[in-house]
A protein has these predicted regions:
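Intrinsically disordered, low-complexity Ser/Thr/Pro/Gly-rich regulatory segments
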Residues: 2-111, 115-314
């Protein structure tokens, strides 16, 4: 056989000096890449199972009083996947720039179990031990942690109080060309991602009030007579088919709204479904998928905003 392109199919082909070594090296590199990918997938699966087992062990030992311990486990999960520019705080109350006005009935959220915060430029208003008051401009995501049961009515009220918070348009900061005030057109406000974390599967229809629902399943565990079949995390986005342009509109409220038919079309092609990761058996690697999806949305928010106004008299 004379065609060199067919040599790999013919065991009788005589290789020139060095050709076999070169092909072996290429095969070795390919094998190493495959092994590396396999190890990454395996490690994420192991981490996922470890998180689930810790959550159920904590729940078995402490029962419904395990709130603090449970939050610590979820916190460790988020610390493992979000960039170091963010800090993850517990026992947070989120405020906006109008909360001090007597005529303003809103302005402070209910307590947030975990908040993913960019504290680089936006200061805490008040911090005393575990208790923190943080301006809405600094908050990229909020997390509500529950065990096996959840009350949708109270959770809806919890999310609504966060959505009611408004960002200031009077902040002042120095940019390259001098002092500027107010937000940039591409980001007029921030709307934190809302994430629910719980055990089992008996948390119905929460994906219509949360951006992500993260449920921990432990094999053979039984919750409300529903038996879990495997140990894993189930990640449920509010709508995995929402494109990145619509996420930008939802999270940042740009002004004017993006126009279709421009470069925005490129972002319209990408949805959270594009960031799903599967193994060879077509099983979703949930934690790795969540890593990519969450961080893509954090990059769209890209806090901090130049919007925070210190408290002042009206």
């Amino acid at each position: 056989m004379s065609d060199s392109s067919d040599r790999r199919f013919d065991p009788q082909v005589k290789f020139k000096k060095g050709e076999r070594t070169e092909m072996n090296n290429e095969t070795s590199k390919t094998d190493k890449k495959k092994k590396l990918i396999k190890n990454i997938v395996h490690n994420y699966s192991q981490l996922e199972q470890s998180i689930v087992n810790q959550l159920y062990m904590t729940n078995d030992i402490h029962g419904p009083t395990a709130g603090g311990a449970r939050e610590d486990i979820w916190r460790q999960m988020f610390e493992a996947i979000v960039p170091k520019k963010f800090v993850i705080e517990s026992s947070v109350f989120i405020i906006d720039s109008k909360f001090h006005k007597e005529e303003y009935k809103r302005g402070v959220s209910q307590e947030v179990d975990l908040a993913i915060i960019d504290e680089t430029y936006t200061p805490y208003i008040f911090r005393y031990g575990r208790l923190k008051f943080v301006p809405i401009e600094a908050v990229a995501a909020v997390v509500e942690c529950k065990s096996k049961n959840s009350d949708k009515a109270s959770l809806t009220n919890w999310t609504n109080q966060i959505e009611y918070l408004t960002t200031s348009t009077e902040g002042i900061a120095r940019m390259q060309h001098g002092l500027v005030t107010g937000g940039v057109p591409a980001q007029q406000k921030t709307s934190p991602l809302k994430i629910f974390c719980g055990l089992g599967s008996k948390h119905d229809n929460l994906d219509d009030i949360f951006d992500f629902v993260v449920l921990a399943h432990q094999k053979d565990a039984k919750i409300d007579e529903v038996k879990m079949t495997e140990t894993k995390l189930e990640i449920i986005p509010s709508d995995e088919n929402t494109n990145l342009s619509d996420w930008h509109q939802k999270l940042n409220s740009p002004r004017p709204a993006p126009k279709r038919g421009s470069e925005d079309d490129e972002f319209s092609k990408h949805t959270l479904k594009n960031y799903e990761v599967y193994d060879r058996d077509n099983n979703n690697i949930s934690l790795l998928t969540f890593n990519f999806q969450l961080n893509q949305l954090l990059m769209i928010i890209n806090n901090p905003l130049l919007l925070f106004t210190p408290l002042k008299k009206s």
